[in-house]
Amino acid sequence: MALNLRKNHPLMKIINDSLIDLPTPSNISVWWNFGSLLGICLVTQIVTGLLLSMHYTADTSLAFASVSHMCRNVQFGWLIRNLHANGASLFFICIYLHIGRGLYYGSYLNKETWNIGVILLLTLMATVFVGYVLPWGQMSSWGATVITNLFSAIPYIGQTLVEWLWGGFSVDNPTLTRFFAFHFLLPFVIAGLTLVHLTFLHETGSNNPLGIPSDCDKIPFHPYYSIKDLLGFVLMLIVLVTLALFNPYMLGDPENFTPDKPLATPPHIKPEWYFLFAYAILRSIPNKLGGVLALAASVLILFLIPLLHTSKQRSMTFRPLSQILWWTLVADLLILTWVGSQPVEHPFIIIGQLASFAYFTIILILFPIASALENKMLNL
């Protein structure tokens, strides 16, 4: 009898065990689609980014012109750039929904998978930040100046660290060239970390909406979930192409159509929409070091989530108090995102401070209390 190549070939076996014969819970919902969508986002970004890098010049005097040249003179350069810029937004939509799913259904109790996931988020944020600097428009260079300057809040070594990061005494040519190098390198680091993320996931198997062990009821990944994922791919690519073709600059900043002017500061320096929640938390604390610590804590708090789990149940499916808190947290993040896009004046300052306080209170205090209360009410 002939050997089944798919199950016996050293390389094919890895693919088979990850994408074809993988035992998967029979009841996972559409919320479990976002992992594979993130994979598609990453591939799309690497391909479009590679094509863009062939025409880009990492020099302060030429960067803006090279991006302009790409959009005007390169075959479909405008489309590749629009797909790349809007692909980043979709990447963040998918990753935020993916994290939200993990929080809601208790997937964070797979601690290794969760921790690698948080590291992936941090790497993605770094990649996107250095990428946003590359077109060298007004918001690019000033964004780089403001965000890198935050490192100067670190006591004793701060100023040295910033100058080392800049490669000089201000954001200039060395900064741009190193940011381009980082932006080229980091997506491949993300790809490597993704494999580690999947390795840890396949050690324990996927969680499911009920949060109960599903060993007794598994189905093969292919054809059931490969078809389900394919539907997700099609829908996401429709959204991406629609955005890139009909309204490519909707999520960008008009300031970035102006080449960098080091002597003229834009009226409102603000990051892209996906960083606004963290930016609002940074701005809500009047002290520089305090703001930087709050900014870091707003993302690093995800590492603490598994330690704050006090419920006897894994998922929030049957926990109404926690569900209310979870949706309150979603609303709070939307408010922070909105406040981050507004100027620093009354009433936005106080709204931002209250929303920042609520963000940390819900995660650190209210979630554990609600979980303990639910245990008590259900006599668990």
UniProtKB/Swiss-Prot annotation:
Q: Which GO terms of the cellular component aspect does the record hold?
A: mitochondrial inner membrane; respiratory chain complex III
- According to the lineage, what is the superkingdom? Eukaryota
The cofactors required by this protein are:
heme b
Q: Which UniProt keywords apply?
A: Electron transport, Heme, Iron, Membrane, Metal-binding, Mitochondrion, Mitochondrion inner membrane, Respiratory chain, Transmembrane, Transmembrane helix, Transport, Ubiquinone
Q: How is the cofactor bound?
A: Binds 2 heme b groups non-covalently.
Q: Which Cys-Cys disulphide bridges does the record give? A: none
Membrane-topology descriptor: Multi-pass membrane protein
Q: Does the keyword Mitochondrion apply?
A: yes
Per the record, the major location class is mitochondrion
- Entry binding sites for a ubiquinone: 202
Under Pfam families, the record lists: Cytochrom_B_C, Cytochrome_B
Q: Which GO terms describe its molecular function?
A: metal ion binding; ubiquinol-cytochrome-c reductase activity
Q: Which GO terms describe its biological process?
A: mitochondrial electron transport, ubiquinol to cytochrome c
Q: Which InterPro entries match?
A: Cyt_b/b6_C (IPR005798), Cyt_b/b6_C_sf (IPR036150), Cyt_b/b6_N (IPR005797), Cytb/b6-like_sf (IPR027387), Cytochrome_b (IPR030689), Cytochrome_b_C_euk/bac (IPR048260), Cytochrome_b_N_euk/bac (IPR048259), Di-haem_cyt_TM (IPR016174)
Q: Where does heme b b566 bind?
A: 98, 197
Q: Where does heme b b562 bind?
A: 84, 183
Q: Which family does it belong to?
A: Belongs to the cytochrome b family.
Note, other: Heme 1 (or BL or b562) is low-potential and absorbs at about 562 nm, and heme 2 (or BH or b566) is high-potential and absorbs at about 566 nm.
Role noted for this protein: Component of the ubiquinol-cytochrome c reductase complex (complex III or cytochrome b-c1 complex) that is part of the mitochondrial respiratory chain. The b-c1 complex mediates electron transfer from ubiquinol to cytochrome c. Contributes to the generation of a proton gradient across the mitochondrial membrane that is then used for ATP synthesis.
Assembly: The cytochrome bc1 complex contains 11 subunits: 3 respiratory subunits (MT-CYB, CYC1 and UQCRFS1), 2 core proteins (UQCRC1 and UQCRC2) and 6 low-molecular weight proteins (UQCRH/QCR6, UQCRB/QCR7, UQCRQ/QCR8, UQCR10/QCR9, UQCR11/QCR10 and a cleavage product of UQCRFS1). This cytochrome bc1 complex then forms a dimer.
The protein's name in its UniProt record: Cytochrome b
Record lineage: Eukaryota, Metazoa, Chordata, Craniata, Vertebrata
Q: Which gene encodes it?
A: MT-CYB
